[in-house]
Amino acid sequence: GLPVTLVHRLREHLTGLWRRADAQPERWVVVDTETSGLDPQRDALLAVGAVAADADGIRIGDSFEVVLRHEAAGDAENVAIHGIGWGAQRAGIPLADAMPAFAAWVADAPCVGFHASFDRTVLARAFAAAGAGAAPARWLDVAELAAALHPEQHKRGERSLDDWLARYGIETASRHTAAG
């Protein structure tokens, strides 16, 4: 699990954020996307991975993962990063099916992400392209939260997800997959 000091500081900060809201959410959704590049305004959404969390922790059994169907092969260098090859993309789920399914799974839960504006922008474009209505609207950016909680680390230029994971001793089995 997360170190106790991180959990305590996150709870304090999140409680303050949601104090202004009508009710504190019971379910949060941690979201990550994989794309065909680094431009959220231009590049294609390849995969969405998400897992629910609540006051008791991460709920692995309450998760969502989808690889989207694409008709054209992606860039080989990009595939080397995220591992979603041409076969997986060709066998993926159509955007018009995936985005409504994701919306139904998220429901009214706020979304959490690292550099969440990227994921939010990519998902908004995908929802629009799928004719699936509005993408999830409530987001918390953990990169901004981490910088607010530890400005000294942010000022030193230690701003990547890997930097923050190292600070808190959090190990991850895989990176650069939407679910990992």
Labelled PLM ranges:
Residues G1-V4:
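Short, Lys/Arg-enriched N-terminal segments with co-localized hydrophobic residues
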Residues G180:
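Acidic, divalent-metal-coordinating active-site segment for phosphoryl/phosphodiester hydrolysis
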Residues L140-R156:
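Short alpha-helix plus adjacent loop in nuclease-associated cores
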Residues V7-V31, T35-A124, A128-A129, A134-P136, ...:
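Conserved non-catalytic scaffold segment of RNase H-like nuclease domains
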